[in-house]
Amino acid sequence: MNNKYSIAILLPTRSRTDALTSSVTSIVDLAHDVSQIQLMFGFDDDDQTGLNHFHQVIRPYLDQRRVAYEAQAFKSMGYAGLNKYYNHLAKSADADWLFVWNDDAVMQTKDWDSVIKQHTGKFKLLKVHTHNEHPYSIFPIVPRAWYNLTTHLSRHQMIDAELSQMAFLLDVMQVIDVDVVHNQVELTKDATDPLKPKVRFEGDPTNPGDFHYPQNGAQRFQDCGVIAEYMRNNGLDTSHWEGVISGKKYAWEKLIELDVNRQMSQFVMEVDEHGKVMSYKQDEKAEAVRNILAK
């Protein structure tokens, strides 16, 4: 089935006004063809500040620029439910590409949409330049088929981490020449930002809500298996994934290749027969892989 638009911008937002305006106008003003862009907004139904700003400022601007958009209001799912907002917006989007965006992000590259469209028809997760070249795709861009296969973008709150780790396991991460500034409050230390630094959902793999909790990782592998089958059926290379599941390849080799500023670390866990984490420690194999790649 053909999609109506080329790129859907998935944009949950709460309370931000000026930041949202800067984010949206950067997307629209720097696009080559706004007729092929769909903006998907997600608001909390109790966010009167955000809703008023949308109706008074954002909506008139988009109408004037003739940009397609849709705004959905949700019962607040909180920061812990961030992935649920994206999953709902992705389900409603009608585009070839689903672009996970934030209201504190600002596009920098002119004709960014043309860069993305160069990859249409390829099964890749696209990664923009941001965050001091963090190896993850902080603002992941995935083909519609990705959502259709798994029926969600992310099971876990850390949507960029989940999608990126799956892309590394499947070897479908593609860096593109698009630059984005992320004005995240943790990075900018902006005391005026209405949303303060967030609770992080990693660092304690014994916690069922943690990104690295074993069952959460197992679900990611399950989703990778579904996507890998689709890739095989379409004649795409799955050799890296096959090597990972057979134990012949180190799972995070592709991640380490992109971690040029050493922003990530890997660890291994010991679990009991019930899947409970007994202990975890730094993964010595990861450092060995780094040393090999550095030669």
Residue ranges and their predicted role:
Residues T25-Q36:
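Short, acidic, metal-binding catalytic loop of nucleotide-sugar glycosyltransferases
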Residues K124-P140:
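Short beta-strand-to-loop element that shapes/binds the nucleotide-sugar donor at the catalytic cleft/hinge
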Residues S35-Q48, Q72-S76:
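Short beta-strand/loop segment that forms part of the nucleotide-sugar
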Residues F41-Q56, A105-V106:
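A conserved acidic beta->alpha catalytic loop
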Residues A161-K295:
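C-terminal catalytic/acceptor-binding lobe
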Residues A95-V106:
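Short beta-strand-to-loop acidic/aromatic patch adjacent to the donor-nucleotide binding site
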Residues K110-V128:
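Conserved donor-nucleotide/metal-binding helix-loop-beta segment in metal-dependent transferases, i.e.
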Residues G50-A93:
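Active-site-proximal specificity loops/subdomain of glycosyltransferases
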